[in-house]
């Protein structure tokens, strides 16, 4: 399933996303940020640069939202049911003093180590990027106008 999804990510996700997508390199985004900050520093004008801390975002993905994203992107009901089954079957057990506790069912988030999880996360994050872009287009955020970086 992860391999089938990976083969289509480059068509589903905007070019701004580079992690976990074949043919794209996450280092490109680091270089873009480095060049952008250098450019801003050289301009010597007050500017803001937004960085989002997504440290816990993987664990807080809303399942209903993810399923709506998949539906919006054209994933059929069978695919969505499979993903829903993967999500609903995830649980955690805590080992304390050698005893394994009861299972704790997850209600949100993506299972780390599950092959499709990074790709599903990218699909959700792409919606966030689209929202930031729309806010910029509507004048709520000011885009950075630069020459070639």
Q: How would you label these PLM feature ranges?
A:
Residues 1-149:
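Nucleotidyl polymerases of mobile genetic elements and RNA viruses
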